[in-house]
């Protein structure tokens, strides 16, 4: 497994234990009494990813404003982008998890993929330093960053600006249901805007459900947006 993923990510660990930790899902602890999982490395990897992406954008777009750089960074470190990168290296098949977690689709769970990818970045940073982490991140993010000619706007931002232009109260998002197991929850969010029909959407986390609800609302009112 170590040799296979090392070839895929083009990085060979000097300390394979770090890679093992980065790929260990929390569900494995209670089963095998292991004292580690990827959560601590995920915390570190998130910080490393943010600083490397920030510096990369700063260098690629010397004329961009702070606001545009921030929007691009948000798009590059968001869950959807992390999942795309994780799927491109088939990370899910390498995550060590309990049989129950895998049976429930844990290898394809977006939260698991996001967390394991950030943990992998953290492990590379500890094993090879900042340069190694930069090389890994650049190889999977730089092409996307270079082709971001127009600063991306998420659905919530577009909807917020449209509603402000109508001089209406800001959209509000309310969690009306949470179902599923703790390791793979499903949130149902209701979007409310005065004078508009309420919209409901679901997602594996609150932010994703809110974005889906905003996107559905935009689709409903698209003829009003010029």
Swiss-Prot record:
Cofactors named for this entry: Mg(2+)
Domain annotation DRBM: ranges: 154-223
Q: Which GO terms describe its molecular function?
A: double-stranded RNA binding; metal ion binding; ribonuclease III activity; rRNA binding
One GO BP: mRNA processing
Q: In which residues is Mg(2+) bound? A: 42, 115, 118
- Catalyzed reactions: Endonucleolytic cleavage to 5'-phosphomonoester
Q: What does this protein do?
A: Digests double-stranded RNA. Involved in the processing of primary rRNA transcript to yield the immediate precursors to the large and small rRNAs (23S and 16S). Processes some mRNAs, and tRNAs when they are encoded in the rRNA operon. Processes pre-crRNA and tracrRNA of type II CRISPR loci if present in the organism.
The record's subunit annotation is:
Homodimer.
Under NCBIfam families, the record lists:
RNaseIII
What is this protein identified as? Ribonuclease 3
Q: Which classification does the entry list for the species?
A: Bacteria, Pseudomonadati, Pseudomonadota, Alphaproteobacteria, Rickettsiales
């Amino acid at each position: 497994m170590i040799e296979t993923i090392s070839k895929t990510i083009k990085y060979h660990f000097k300390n394979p234990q770090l890679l093992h930790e980065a790929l260990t899902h929390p569900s494995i602890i209670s089963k095998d009494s292991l004292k580690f999982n990827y959560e601590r490395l995920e915390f570190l990897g998130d910080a490393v990813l943010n600083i490397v992406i920030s510096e990369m954008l700063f260098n690629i777009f010397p004329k961009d404003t702070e606001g545009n750089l921030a929007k691009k960074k948000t798009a590059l470190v968001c869950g959807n982008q992390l999942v795309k990168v994780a799927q491109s290296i088939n990370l899910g098949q390498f995550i060590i998890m309990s049989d129950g977690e895998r049976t429930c689709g844990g290898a394809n769970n977006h939260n698991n993929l996001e967390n394991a990818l950030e943990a992998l970045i953290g492990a590379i940073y500890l094993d090879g330093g900042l340069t190694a982490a930069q090389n890994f991140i650049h190889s999977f993010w730089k092409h996307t960053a270079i082709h971001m000619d127009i600063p991306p706007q998420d659905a919530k931002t577009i909807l917020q600006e449209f509603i402000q232009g109508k001089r209406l109260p800001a959209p509000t998002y309310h969690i009306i249901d949470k179902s599923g197991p703790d390791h793979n929850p499903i949130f149902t969010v209701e979007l409310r805007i005065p004078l508009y029909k309420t919209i409901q959407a679901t997602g594996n986390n609150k932010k994703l459900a809110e974005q889906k609800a905003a996107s559905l609302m935009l689709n409903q009112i698209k003829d009003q947006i010029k």
